[in-house]
Every structure is written in structure tokens, then in C-alpha cells.
Amino acid sequence: TEGPYFYVPMVNTTGIVRSPYEYPQYYLVNPAAYAVLGAYMFFLIILGFPINFLTLYVTLEHKKLRTPLNYILLNLAVADLFMVIGGFTTTMYSSMHGYFVLGRLGCNLEGFSATLGGMISLWSLAVLAIERWVVVCKPISNFRFGENHAIMGVSLTWTMALACTVPPLVGWSRYIPEGMQCSCGIDYYTRAEGFNNESFVLYMFFCHFMVPLIIIFFCYGRLLCAVKEAAAAQQESETTQRAEREVTRMVILMVIGYLVCWLPYASVAWFIFTHQGSEFGPLFMTIPAFFAKSSSIYNPVIYICMNKQFRNCMITTLFCGKNPFEGEEEGASSTKTEASSASSVSPA
């Protein structure tokens, strides 16, 4: 059922469909589902906010973390905080009422904040892949990665994210309640006159999903080849082989993390867009959104907590200046000094 600035995934044959800005949507799913949604958002908030805020705090506290190669990781933490503060809190609050209680303006603000955080995060992963490829594979001779390059990378993520999130605010597509009608996102559902949703969805799918995906696969593919070549040149070195395995594991985790986060959401959004008019339940879009929102937790785990330097500094901060595991960390890392080119992207 399509209305002004909303689309409810239910045929209004019985006349029970109401505006998701004004009335509870308990006719869509069991009211218990809204309680589950609220509990899940609360879970993401109590885990996502501390770990991402701690990343920023630890970086301010430890000067050795403030290096150009870590700028993009901090940007990733900021993006996740955008999602937590601007998106998860409002979704949790709305789910407690069973509909989007913040109105049309609130929908625009929530949709913009959550999508902005998601897009910054997505492009940060692509820029991170480029940076690691450039540093390890050295496609440009005599190139030295510096602060200006890091700032350019961070600026690119914000530019691309804003290029995706601002247009719906000014008339190219729009933000509407989606799924269980407690959070807002891009309108994949309708061909509302005057909004040019078709062209925007095509632009978003190819420029803001396929392009980062191609970048990530290319850069990490080249990086793996470089690491394997380095390991093949030192076959007798056990430390080099171990470093190769760790880099391979890290790359696999990065690619899987990206796909788990964005592939379900992008695939379902594309299906809805290409099958407009077909019947689908509210959970059809809600569940893939869970995967995308969960990135605020597993992104910092994969990209930050698995980074030895960040991990040690976090532990030191949490234990008031002492690292009770320092002996174990040193013992585990002392065998990795030979494979410098591989360990430069190693997670531990």
C-alpha cells in the first residue's frame, strides 16, 4: 500500500493499513517482533558504542597510533558511531511504539544519519584496501604513503557518502519507513512520480556497491599474490609462511565481512526494485538490514581489535596503563620479524 511518503508492504483489502508515522503497525507482524527488534537495537548500542568510542579514545591517548595508515580505521569508527547514535537509537525508540513516531522530518534525519554512517563505512573498507595494496604491492615506484594521502582517503569516503545520502533530501529519491516501519531508508519500493527512484537506485547499486566491491576484490587479490610471492621466495622461513597464513586469514575475513554486511541488503533491495508490485513481507527487508547494522560491531573487531598495535593499546588503557598479556603478545610476535612486507598488513 503506497501513501504520501510511505510504503507499507501489505495490500489494503481490509482497510487496516495506516500511516507508519501516526499509528502502530502491529497488523504487519506479531507485536513481539517489535520487542525483538528493540532488544536487538539495544544490543547493538551497548556493544557498538563502547568499542567504537574506545577506538577513538585509545588513539587520542596513545600517540603511536596516530599514524597515517590508521586514519581510515578511525574514520571507520566514526562511521559506526554515526550508525549507532543516529540510526540505532531512533529505531529502538520507534520499535517500542510499533511505528515511526518521529514523523517525516525524523525519518529524513534518521535515514540520512544511518545511511551516511553505512556509506562512510563501506567506502572506508574500499579505501583501506587501496591503501594496503599501495603500501604492500608498491604499484607506484618511490611512493611513500603520508598524512596527505591518508587525509585524501578519508575525504573520499565522506565525499562519496554524501553523494549518496544528500540527493534523497533534495528530491532525487527519498527516505521512507522500511521493513517493520520503525526505521527509514532509501525508497527502493515505489516509482513515485517526481522522485526518479529508478535512476537513483541504479546509481546507488552500481556506484556505491559494485564499485567498492570490485576495488576490494582487486586490491586484496593483488595483495595476496604479493604475499604469496614473498613467501615462495623464502620457503625455508617458517615465520614468512606463518605471516602469509595470517595475512590470508585477515583478507578472507575482510572480504567476508563486507559481503555479509552489504550483499544481503543490496540483493534484497535490488530484488524489490526489479519486482515492484510483488508481494513480500515486512521481515523480507528487515532481516537483511540486521546484517548491515551489525557491521558496527564486527567491523571494529576485524579491522581494529585484530590489529596487534590497537589491541595492545586498548588493553593497556582498560587496565589503567598496564598490559597483563604483554609477555604473551611479545612471545607470539617475536617470531614474525623476518617477513616485514607481509606483516605490514597482518592482523596480529
Curated annotation (Swiss-Prot):
Residue intervals annotated with topology Cytoplasmic: 59-70, 131-149, 222-249, 306-348
Lipidation (S-palmitoyl cysteine): 320
Entry's family note: Belongs to the G-protein coupled receptor 1 family. Opsin subfamily.
SS bond list: 107-184
Extracellular side: 1-33, 94-107, 171-199, 272-283
One GO CC term on file: membrane
Biological processes per GO annotation: absorption of visible light; G protein-coupled opsin signaling pathway; visual perception
Free-text description of this protein's post-translational modifications in UniProt: Phosphorylated on some or all of the serine and threonine residues present in the C-terminal region.
Keyword Lipoprotein: yes
Superkingdom field: Eukaryota
TM segment ranges: 34-58, 71-93, 108-130, 150-170, 200-221, 250-271, 284-305
Gene Ontology molecular functions: 11-cis retinal binding; G protein-coupled photoreceptor activity
Stretches with biased composition (Low complexity): 332-348
Location of region: Disordered: 327-348
UniProtKB keywords: Cell projection, Chromophore, Disulfide bond, G-protein coupled receptor, Glycoprotein, Lipoprotein, Membrane, Palmitate, Phosphoprotein, Photoreceptor protein, Receptor, Retinal protein, Sensory transduction, Transducer, Transmembrane, Transmembrane helix, Vision
Modified residues (N6-(retinylidene)lysine): 293
Glycosylation sites: 12, 197
Keyword presence, Kinase: no
Subcellular location: Membrane; Cell projection, Cilium, Photoreceptor outer segment
Protein name per its UniProtKB record: Rhodopsin
Bilayer topology annotation: Multi-pass membrane protein
Function: Photoreceptor required for image-forming vision at low light intensity. While most salt water fish species use retinal as chromophore, most freshwater fish use 3-dehydroretinal, or a mixture of retinal and 3-dehydroretinal. Light-induced isomerization of 11-cis to all-trans retinal triggers a conformational change that activates signaling via G-proteins. Subsequent receptor phosphorylation mediates displacement of the bound G-protein alpha subunit by arrestin and terminates signaling.
Name of the gene encoding the protein in the UniProt record: rho
Alphabetical list of InterPro entries matching this protein: GPCR_opsins (IPR050125), GPCR_Rhodpsn (IPR000276), GPCR_Rhodpsn_7TM (IPR017452), Opsin (IPR001760), Retinal_BS (IPR027430), Rhodopsin (IPR000732), Rhodopsin_N (IPR019477)
